[in-house]
């Protein structure tokens, strides 16, 4: 089956932002104006197409990244309500991501497979904590982006304030390509700085848009920002810079070409404005997606590793061998869905592929593309496509699927560690099996959700990214798996690390009692590593003192020993273990003996290396009326918080601080009572920090160590 839309006319984009900036409403308007839906869905009515889980519709928040395919033809500048005559049609695959920090993995895995992002900002709130997190995630994967300043109809809307915040707080080269005409109730149109034309909205549903002259009172402002636009574009290209110096302006075609180049390279972030809820600015946003965000062929070829360890890249082309990344798993009444991004080649229904991450074959029995929770069966997925495979057996998030005859492993995605745990137990004995199945299914879908068993109490422990994350998962157990569970109080995910390096620590496991014995012997150095690195293993074995086949088992033993530290049984992080020496026995040595020796060496080294306890620190932003600021700051100090600054606008003060997670449980209730219900806060994980000695001693005593 031939490709219906050339790859150059495909856009894989995400819509990401802080919670309540209007991402889902923006997505709904995109679907409405592109003709995929004929009635506008609203988040607050629970009718949004992309919010299809029961909890999403009840809470008015997006939890999972819904993938949707739609089409768009550029508008006619002379008649902005209509498509441009003879203009080609583009395919746009959209992922609507959650803004709540507890669902950060959904944003992370979306960023990994997208080519471009619309970052939505609230015209009043501007750059908020989760905006910064989303921006960092987009930076991690070098995703080009455009900024859409939404809610221009809100009281206090200020486009240029958001422009300055993006430049200052996100350190991005934001360049307005539009200016709003009016604000709040008076927001009635947009000035297009590329075409130097105003567009006025004549009706409520944003379908009757008319070109108009630029308002007289805006001419100075428009001239100022047009000059900034031209200068920013000229700086992306030497030929344009020469033209700019010669003529002091650039043509519409030059500006569009320069903006596209600058956006794709990450040098420029074009800024647009509108009000998705009031149906203004969305068609121009879609035009900008087509004009400035990359197609799969505009981005660098995806890098991967061959079975022999050498690097290879795969271009976005149907002629290359097939390769794809599984970025999300989902179960529902129809079965298991594995969402994939095809990077190269063609995937056809009825064929076999290799899961190169696990070295297992998978049969492709059914392929679908999605309109939120509606599935459309297709016979194939091609390079650049986002789609889903039904019924894969062994594939999980981050796995590579590829052609059996051209194996490759693509770079996976960053998965943050959970910071909060609770104990769960079934309410009745009849629910025991159902609970186990439910937890397995949910953990398969969500890599930030972990399930473990406490060895001392035998309780089932679930861990996740925050209280809301775990609350929603427990809710899903009841709705989707019909399991009622009792949930314990939240527990902090502490960690352990070391403060000083130790060298040549021995681990020796010897058993000789008739017959074949056991012999494993390793010597390691242990040292602190950079914060955030987790665990690193290095082998400096030379001359075969430890044979190659025993180095892997020794590393495995060391890694497993890190899962339970020496102070209070919490995982050891941010350490580097180097295997420097050892010995073996021709007959008695075995993989198991070296695994045990590695574990013994790590435990002994950690005891000698001045171990210490770490706790998760949260980045907290509180918004309160000025009258309550003193109480809020006093409360943050009482919670062992570290103040980082505050600013006041329009009678509301934003207080920024870092606070230990252990001190933040129940804060939502406390902040409401301290501010007569007028204070709100957001928090997200920042980093791990050493626990003060007096508090650490109490935690260690409670856990009695885990020698």
From Swiss-Prot:
SMART domains: EFG_C (SM00838), EFG_IV (SM00889). Gene3D superfamilies: 3.30.230.10, 3.30.70.240, Elongation Factor G (Translational Gtpase), domain 3 (3.30.70.870), P-loop containing nucleotide triphosphate hydrolases (3.40.50.300), Translation factors (2.40.30.10). GO terms for molecular function: GTP binding; GTPase activity; translation elongation factor activity. Its main location: cytoplasm. GO terms for cellular component: cytoplasm. InterPro entries: EFG_II (IPR041095), EFG_III (IPR009022), EFG_III/V (IPR035647), EFG_IV (IPR047872), EFG_V (IPR035649), EFG_V-like (IPR000640), EFTu-like_2 (IPR004161), G_TR_CS (IPR031157). Transmembrane segments: none annotated. GTP binds at residues 17-24, 96-100, 150-153. Keywords: Cytoplasm, Elongation factor, GTP-binding, Nucleotide-binding, Protein biosynthesis. It is found in: Cytoplasm. GO terms for biological process: ribosome disassembly. Residues 8-297 form the tr-type G domain. Catalyzes the GTP-dependent ribosomal translocation step during translation elongation. During this step, the ribosome changes from the pre-translocational (PRE) to the post-translocational (POST) state as the newly formed A-site-bound peptidyl-tRNA and P-site-bound deacylated tRNA move to the P and E sites, respectively. Catalyzes the coordinated movement of the two tRNA molecules, the mRNA and conformational changes in the ribosome. Belongs to the TRAFAC class translation factor GTPase superfamily. Classic translation factor GTPase family. EF-G/EF-2 subfamily. This is Elongation factor G. It comes from Synechococcus sp. (strain JA-2-3B'a(2-13)). The gene is fusA.
